Every structure is written in C-alpha cells, then in structure tokens.
Regions:
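Conserved short "hinge" loops at termini or chain/domain junctions
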Residues: 1-67, 128-148
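Short loop/turn elements at secondary-structure junctions
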Residues: 3-4, 78-148
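Generic beta-strand or strand-like secondary-structure segments
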Residues: 42, 46, 71, 75-79, ...
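Ordered, amphipathic secondary-structure segments that act as subunit-interaction surfaces
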Residues: 53, 65-89
Length: 148
C-alpha cells in the first residue's frame, strides 16, 4: 500500500479545535463555546509554535490528528476548561488520559523530533518515524483507538 504523507498545518489545528470545543465548559460548568472561540487565536498561536518546529514533516493522518487533539486538550485544561459532563464517559476519560499522557511524554522527551524516514506497516497498525541513529517515535493503535 503506497504511503501518502500529509503535512500538519495551522488549518488542521483550527479544524480540530472547532470539532472539540462545543463540549468544553468553564470552571463553573457553564458551556463556554463563544468564550473559548475568543481564545482561539491565542490557542492557535501555541499550537502553531508546537507544531512547526517539530512536525513540519510528513506524518500520517492518524498521528497528526491525535497529536493535535492531545495538545489542544492540554492547552484547554491549562486554561481551566473542563469537559462538559454530558459528553464524558468512563471510557472517554480513560482514552483521553492515555492520549494526553502519550502526547506529553513525546513532547517532554523530544522523541517526536522527526527524522527523514517515515514508514507505515499495514495489518499491525504500527507507525514508525525517524531515521537510523536518530530519534524514533513508535505509535500502536489500541482497540479504543488511542495512540501511544
């Protein structure tokens, strides 16, 4: 199966932000969609600063979306927003925790500074990025769809 790279862009990040913002609330539990949208430009700036130095290289769609979602969740939580209770389930909380932990681990370790090679293996759902002698990031998809 041919490997088709995509590139992370600020537009990708904005799309992901808009897809998840509707179910976030402020610390008082009130839906704050319009307020968060006012924060969108600042959040996008942080997402952009996070993406471009490290991820302006071809990566797969699944990894791109996961990294954007996880990082945006980190940014929203840092601003005091919480998931809307109606949208939460035990499964979604556990999945989000795994995803965010994985994104933070990769960010903190610097493991996601991608090298020149990218490989996608079918069947096992494993993504490996990096180059010989360089940093390599490996993602396996669980039955719940979390990457880490």
């Amino acid at each position: 199966m041919p490997y088709t790279p995509i590139y992370l862009t600020l537009s990708d990040a904005q799309t992901e932000l808009q897809n998840i913002l509707w179910c976030w609330t402020d610390v008082n539990g009130a839906l704050q969609t319009s307020y968060i949208l006012d924060d969108l430009q600042a959040i996008e700036g942080e997402v952009s600063a996070f993406l471009y130095p490290r991820y302006d290289l071809p990566v797969t769609d699944a990894v791109s979306i996961q990294l954007i979602r996880s990082y945006v969740i980190v940014l929203l939580r840092a601003r005091g927003y919480n998931r809307h209770p109606v949208s939460e389930t035990p499964e979604s909380i556990m999945q989000e925790a795994r995803q965010t932990r994985g994104a933070l681990r990769d960010l903190n370790s610097g493991a996601m500074v991608l090298g020149g090679a990218a490989q996608k293996t079918t069947g096992t759902r494993v993504e490996t990025f990096g180059q010989a002698g360089g940093n390599t990031a490996r993602f396996t998809q669980t039955s719940l769809g979390a990457w880490g």
